[in-house]
Amino acid sequence: NRTYKVKAETGQSYTTPLVVMKEGKEVIITFGSDHLTAHTAEDGKLLWDCGGYNPGDKAMWRVIASPSISKDIVVVPYGRKGYFAAVKAEGEGDITKTNRLWTKDVGADVPSPIAHGDKAYLITDRGHIYCFDLESGDQIWDQKLPRSSASYYSSPIISGQRMVLAREDGVVMVMKLLEGGFELLSENKMNERLIASPIPIDNRLYLRGQKHLFCLGG
């Protein structure tokens, strides 16, 4: 049974919410196209609201890429490849003017970014990877993956200093993250269309293809 109901902002949001712990309680952070909001998991109470993600106030302003969080900073891609922003996830009420840390004129429509440690990584649909300082927003590096006619729809994952990213045409790439870029370690052909994001569980990597579920590892 549904425990509570919170008013939906829009029907044009396809993002996945974040679940974090704050003072021993679960908090749900969700991106609803125009606003980033935080709610208590227990009763849905609105804790804070950060707006400004629909600059032109358009009626049909859908979002697909999900937010990511590290060190209480949420990174948000929005504007259909237009923008990438960071917000300090704390406070009460409207935190739009007080907690927005930075905004960049680069974004991703489908792949979700990763906030990892003190860095934020953004991957565009065409395989251009950007690395930013999480707190200041300073760009540390950017580098392109091998050129291909296929796009990137799945979101990357990071384990240690390795990033794993699947391309639409079934090529799974493993990269070593460096201070000034990345080293491409391998390109693995699954021979099947891949759109879903890879999932790591117990030292194994699961990939859902168009026809099969793959499990990699030992």
Question: Predicted segment positions?
Answer:
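Residue-level signal for well-ordered, solvent-exposed loop/turn and beta-edge residues enriched
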Residues: 1, 45, 138, 181-183, ...
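Residue-level signature of beta-propeller blades and closely related beta-rich strand-turn architectures
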Residues: 23, 32-34, 80, 126, ...
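Beta-rich carbohydrate-recognition and catalytic domains
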Residues: 38-43, 47, 78, 84-85, ...
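Short loop/turn segments immediately following beta-strands, especially the blade-tip
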Residues: 41-44, 84-95, 134-135, 174-181, ...
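Loop/turn-rich, solvent-exposed surfaces of beta-rich toroidal or solenoidal domains
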Residues: 73, 82-84, 105-180
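Blade-level signature of beta-propeller repeat domains, shared across WD40, Kelch, NHL, RCC1
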Residues: 169-171, 192-218
